[in-house]
């Protein structure tokens, strides 16, 4: 996992294709280090991402909405028409940054 802080947001990049483990490792960071930060999850390297994988982030996305913070996932492998409206997914990092700013 690679974390890059910017002025208005933090980008967390997943380094492996084990999304269950990534979410498991991410959750403690969300409670402390990344608390109160707008968050971009960079999953561009995951070319086999499925809707099932995306739903691993549902609880995190919901918590960010309650906290009035942005939570955006970046992945271009998913079909935009099959995505739940509750989770924001964009195909590029630039679009994710634009959504937060």
Language model regions located:
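STAS-typified acidic loop motif
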Residues: 1-28
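Short aromatic-glycine-(Arg/Gly/Cys) micro-motifs in beta-strand/loop hairpins
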Residues: 6, 61-83
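Conserved beta-strand segments of the P-loop GTPase G domain that flank and frequently precede/overlap
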Residues: 12-14, 39-44, 73-74
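Short, glycine-/small-residue-enriched flexible loop/hinge segments at domain edges that mediate gating
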Residues: 23-54
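Short, solvent-exposed loop/turn segments at secondary-structure boundaries
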Residues: 51-53, 84-87
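Short acidic-hydrophobic, aromatic-tinged amphipathic segments that line or gate anion-handling sites
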Residues: 88-96
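A charged, well-structured terminal subsegment
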Residues: 97-101
